């Protein structure tokens, strides 16, 4: 498998209901299998939760190529439309513009989101995450 290297993938988040609003997510992962990581991201579920003014972006994946703990990223986004009313959970539906002929991943890789979960599911996840982070 070879030695693992630290790879950074920048992904633009787009709100399908307001295409003018985007945010940038930087995923850092120790892996030497970027193509497989990209395939994994295409099947992942991305959670975004705003707690105490901080936006937590959590990518849920069962990938062996990039453990979940390595791709949890937190940032203080001030204008992220998918976080209205405290946060939405979106399912990753499409991963485009991510492959180059040389096998590298394009820095402008774009993700399209869909499928907002119910408020009860969102509240349950928010409570679990808040407990995990020690914020309640």
UniProtKB/Swiss-Prot annotation:
Subcellular location: Host cytoplasm; Host mitochondrion; Host nucleus
InterPro entries: Pneumo_NS1
UniProt keyword list: Host cytoplasm, Host mitochondrion, Host nucleus, Host-virus interaction, Inhibition of host adaptive immune response by virus, Inhibition of host innate immune response by virus, Inhibition of host interferon signaling pathway by virus, Inhibition of host IRF3 by virus, Inhibition of host IRF7 by virus, Inhibition of host MAVS by virus, Inhibition of host RIG-I by virus, Inhibition of host RLR pathway by virus, Inhibition of host STAT2 by virus, Inhibition of host TBK1 by virus, Inhibition of host TLR pathway by virus, Interferon antiviral system evasion, Modulation of host cell apoptosis by virus, Viral immunoevasion
Chief site of localization: host cell
GO biological process, one term: symbiont-mediated suppression of host JAK-STAT cascade via inhibition of STAT2 activity
Pfam families for the chain: Pneumo_NS1
Gene Ontology terms: cellular component: host cell mitochondrion; host cell nucleus
Similarity annotation: Belongs to the pneumovirus non-structural protein 1 family.
Function comment: Plays a major role in antagonizing the type I IFN-mediated antiviral response by degrading or inhibiting multiple cellular factors required for either IFN induction or response pathways. Acts cooperatively with NS2 to repress activation and nuclear translocation of host IFN-regulatory factor IRF3. Also disrupts the association of IRF3 with CREBBP. Interacts with host mitochondrial-associated membrane (MAM) MAVS and prevents the interaction with RIGI. Interacts with TRIM25 to suppress TRIM25-mediated RIGI ubiquitination and thereby RIGI-MAVS interaction.
Record note on quaternary structure: Monomer. Homomultimer. Heteromultimer with NS2. Interacts with the matrix protein M. Interacts with host ELOC and CUL2; this interaction allows NS1 to form an active E3 ligase with ELOC and CUL2. Interacts with host IRF3; this interaction leads to the disrupted association of IRF3 with CREBBP and thus reduced binding of IRF3 to the IFN-beta promoter. Interacts with host MAVS; this interaction prevents MAVS binding to RIGI and inhibits signaling pathway leading to interferon production.
Record protein name field: Non-structural protein 1
Organism, scientific name: Bovine respiratory syncytial virus (strain A51908)
């Amino acid at each position: 498998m070879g030695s693992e290297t630290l790879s950074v993938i920048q992904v633009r988040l787009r709100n399908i209901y307001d295409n003018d609003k985007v945010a940038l997510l930087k995923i850092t992962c120790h892996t030497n299998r970027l193509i497989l990581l990209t395939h994994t991201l295409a099947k992942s579920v991305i959670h975004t939760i705003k707690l105490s003014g901080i936006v937590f972006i959590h990518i849920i994946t069962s990938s062996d190529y990039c453990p979940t703990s390595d791709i949890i990223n937190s940032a203080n986004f001030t204008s992220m439309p998918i976080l209205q009313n405290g946060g939405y959970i979106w399912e990753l539906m499409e991963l485009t513009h991510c492959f180059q002929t040389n096998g590298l991943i394009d820095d402008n890789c774009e993700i399209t989101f869909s499928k907002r979960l119910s408020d009860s599911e969102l509240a349950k996840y928010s409570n679990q995450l808040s407990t995990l982070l020690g914020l309640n």
